[in-house]
Amino acid sequence: VDDSTTLDIFWGLYEIMGVSLVDMYMWQWLYANPTATADQLRQATISIAKDVWNKYYQPVLGEKDSPILACYSHMVNSPMYLPNYPFGHIIEFQLEEHFAKCANQKAFADEMMRIYRLGRLTPNQWMQQAVGANVSTDPILNAIDRIVK
């Protein structure tokens, strides 16, 4: 996998993980405050977004108290939908690395068909059979470490 692709996947993962954390914390807040009004939920979500930003993004990007992670309005009408996105980025990178090992286009096509035929499995079971490893952030973190050194 080339460095640009790795960085693109990593950045997408980093970005959506923040929104996913806001989603999870917002739902925890809502369950703890079942009689909250829409305005109270809005204010809580903005506060949560700022907290997540300050903990995970401000040290890297420098801006303090950014509410931008609260921008996904569908986190309210599609509960716990956003936390699934990071898994997609993690799996994407593991598959990219796996396919990069194919010697030629035929090997790639054969491997793609093998993986497609695995059927409906849980994500981790699918990955074990597809690439021989659990779903893990280790491959992308190791690749990022290699790139930035």
Description of each model-found segment:
Residues 1-8:
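Conserved active-site neighborhood of enzyme catalytic/cofactor-binding cores
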Residues 10-15:
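Active-site substrate-recognition segment that forms the wall
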Residues 16, 20-149:
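C-terminal, non-catalytic "cap/extension" segments appended to globular domains
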